[in-house]
C-alpha cells in the first residue's frame, strides 16, 4: 500500500521508490517540448533554459529527502533523462562533452551539492531546524579536538535510518 507524503510516494512493502519512477516519467514527457523547440530552430542556450526550468526542476524536487537512500539503479534512471536531454540539444556531442560545453554537472553530483547546501543552512544558529542537528564535537565533549566544528555522528540502529538526510549528512561532513 503506497503512502503519499508531500507529493512523494513510497511503497512501504518492497522499499521501491514509486516517486522516482513517476518523476522520470513526468520528465520524459516534457522532453517532447525540447524536441519541438529544437525542430523550430531554437538556439541551444534557450533549450538549456527550458531544460533547467521544466525538466531539471522536476528531477530535483525534494531531492534532500530521497537522495541518500536512492539505489544506483534509480539514480541512473534519473541521470538518463539528462543524457537524453543533452542528446536532443547537442546531437553530435557525447554526454561528457555536452556537460563540459554547458557547464553542467551530473545530477548525482548536483543533488549532493544541494543536500550539502541545505545541511549548511540548517546548521546556522538562526535556523529553526538547528535543534535537529547533533551538537558539534566541541559542544558534546568540551574538548578542543581537531575536528571540533564537525557535528557528532548520529547512532543508527538500521541502515534505512542511516541513509536518511541528517545521519547521512553528518557522515558526509566527517568524510566517510
Name the predicted role of every residue range.
Residues 1-176:
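Hydrophobic/basic alpha-helical segments
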Amino acid at each position: 500500500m503506497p503512502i503519499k507524503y508531500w507529493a512523494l510516494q513510497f511503497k512501504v512493502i518492497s522499499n521501491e521508490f514509486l516517486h522516482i519512477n513517476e518523476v522520470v516519467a513526468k520528465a520524459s514527457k516534457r522532453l517532447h517540448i525540447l524536441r519541438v523547440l529544437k525542430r523550430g530552430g531554437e538556439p541551444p542556450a534557450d533549450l538549456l533554459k527550458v531544460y533547467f526550468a521544466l525538466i531539471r526542476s522536476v528531477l530535483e524536487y525534494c531531492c534532500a529527502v530521497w537522495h541518500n537512500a536512492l539505489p544506483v539503479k534509480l539514480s541512473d534512471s534519473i541521470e538518463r533523462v539528462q543524457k537524453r536531454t543533452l542528446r536532443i540539444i547537442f546531437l553530435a556531442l557525447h554526454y561528457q562533452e555536452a556537460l563540459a560545453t554547458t557547464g553542467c554537472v551530473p545530477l548525482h553530483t548536483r543533488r549532493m551539492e544541494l543536500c550539502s547546501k541545505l545541511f549548511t543552512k540548517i546548521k546556522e544558529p538562526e535556523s529553526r531546524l538547528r535543534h535537529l542537528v547533533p551538537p558539534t564535537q566541541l559542544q558534546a565533549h568540551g574538548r578542543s579536538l581537531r575536528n571540533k566544528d564537525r557535528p557528532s555522528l548520529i547512532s543508527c540502529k538500521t541502515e534505512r535510518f542511516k541513509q536518511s538526510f541528517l545521519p547521512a549528512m553528518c557522515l558526509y561532513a566527517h568524510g566517510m
